[in-house]
Each structure stands twice: as C-alpha cells, then as structure tokens.
C-alpha cells in the first residue's frame, strides 16, 4: 500500500474506528484524532505504537487548524488523510436552534477546510491524498435533518474545489457517499429523537409531531434494509486511499446506490411527494 503514514480524523468510533483498524492491519502508521482523553487512551492501549492519538475539538476550527499544523509538523511524512468525523443533528427546521446550524457547519465543513490547509504542504511533498466522508444526504435533502443536510450539500461543493485546486500539485481528493450506517451514534440518535418527541408541548406536537414519528419510522426501517456496517463503509474509504487513480466520488452501500439511482430519474415534485408520503404515512 502506497499510503504508509495516514492521518484519520475522528478515529474513536463508527467508520473512523474501522478505518484505523483496516490501516493498522495493513501495516500503516496511523495518527488519529478524537474528542475525549478516554477515547485516546483506549485506542493507544489497543494498538500500542501503531497508532498515535491527539485530542482535537472540531467545533473550534481556528484552534483545530493550529492543532493540525502541530500534528503534521511532528510527522516525518504524511501520505494520506481520511476525514471521518461529523455530527448529524435532527429535528424540524422550524424548531432547530440557529446555534445547531453553526455548530454543524463548524464541525462538518469549516473544520474540513482547516484540515486541508494544515495538511496540504505535507501532502504535496508525498503526492498524497485526502478522502472525505460525505453522505447521500449531500445529494438528497432528507426531511427532519436540515442542519446535517445543509453541511453535506456544502461539503460536496467544497470537495470539488479542493480536488481541482489540489490536483495540479499532485494531491488527489475523493468523497465517499454512504447511505445508512449501523453505528452506535445512529442508534443514539434514535434515542434522542424519541426523547425530544416526548418533551414537545401540545402545540409543537400537533404541528411537528408527525415529523419525529415519520423520521423514527423511516430511520428504523432503513437501518434494517440495506444499511451498511461501519466496516463496509471503511472498506470503501480504503479503496479511495489505495486506488492508483481514485474516483472523485465513491457511493458506499446498496441503499445509497439505490437511492441515488432512483432520485436521478425523478423531478423535484416527485421527490417532494415521495418524502411527504413517507413522513405522513
């Protein structure tokens, strides 16, 4: 494998953890970032000297930029970066606090710019690459997930600009677009939505309760019908890291392939009708 020294952003759980494991099994030297000290201790205990952990809070991208520059300067070389960290807040658009949108953009978009700026000098030296974890939610605007959807749509354009600006200097940039992923974070998300639904007052429940109920119904069904495991998505990330000439985008998961294929043949009106039927059922 050409990518011998890899930075994995968000290596504590889900796809990021699976990517770290695959890279270690291939003999790569991995540096990863996590949010909590306990997560770092757990990873370093599991992998020993094969994985080095750093605490980075992506909700403050200015501080994250400084930290990522420090991380890169401590490495003798950097062959690849895999960005797997994100948050996925849920809720009706009308009720979602503006602070939720700001935090989602900071973590899911602005921090990606910080990572790009911090790592590009080293990646130019090795002809390396960056792999970002997007979502089919960057192509399909899912009801009840406006903050997440907005950031993933933004990431699509951001990745295109990164790829076009990096390519002339020998750095490749790819985006992986998974559908549903069976992770602890997603299951906790369902718990949180049930809690938020139960906490609605009578007025908000009358106005918006169907959105919570529809989301729970759609998400629970989706997790059982074609959703991927974190390991399966990680394999696609690894494909993007290893390919001699990587694709600009990789669709990960049978559900993602089906959804993107279907949506591509539908009008906006048809898509609106489809989502309204799913949520009003």
Predicted regions and their residues:
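Rossmann-fold cofactor-recognition segment
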Residues: 47-62
């Amino acid at each position: 494998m050409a990518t011998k020294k890899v930075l994995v952003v968000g290596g504590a759980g889900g796809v990021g953890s699976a990517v770290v494991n695959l890279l270690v099994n291939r003999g790569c030297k991995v540096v990863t970032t996590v949010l909590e000290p306990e997560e770092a201790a757990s990873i370093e205990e599991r992998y020993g000297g094969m994985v080095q952990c750093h605490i980075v809070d992506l909700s403050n991208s200015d501080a994250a930029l400084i930290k990522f520059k420090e991380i890169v300067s401590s490495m003798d070389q950097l062959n690849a970066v895999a960005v797997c960290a994100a948050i996925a807040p849920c809720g009706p658009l009308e009720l979602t606090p503006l602070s939720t949108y700001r935090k989602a953009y900071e973590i899911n978009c602005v921090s990606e710019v910080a990572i790009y700026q911090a790592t590009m000098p080293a990646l130019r030296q090795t002809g390396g690459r960056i792999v970002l974890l997007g979502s089919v939610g960057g192509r399909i605007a899912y009801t009840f997930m406006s903050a997440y959807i907005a950031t993933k749509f933004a990431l699509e354009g951001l990745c295109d600009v990164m790829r076009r600006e990096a390519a002339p200097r020998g750095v490749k940039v790819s985006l992986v677009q998974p559908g549903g992923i069976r992770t602890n974070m997603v299951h906790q998300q369902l718990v949180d939505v049930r809690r938020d639904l139960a906490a609605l007052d009578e007025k908000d429940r009358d106005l918006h309760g169907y959105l919570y109920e529809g989301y729970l119904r759609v998400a629970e069904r989706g997790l059982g019908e074609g959703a991927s495991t974190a390991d399966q998505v990680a394999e696609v990330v690894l494909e993007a890291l290893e390919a001699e000439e990587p694709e600009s985008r990789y669709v990960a998961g049978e559900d993602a392939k089906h959804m993107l294929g279907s949506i591509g043949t539908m009008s906006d009106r048809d898509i609106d009708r489809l989502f309204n039927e799913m949520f009003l059922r």
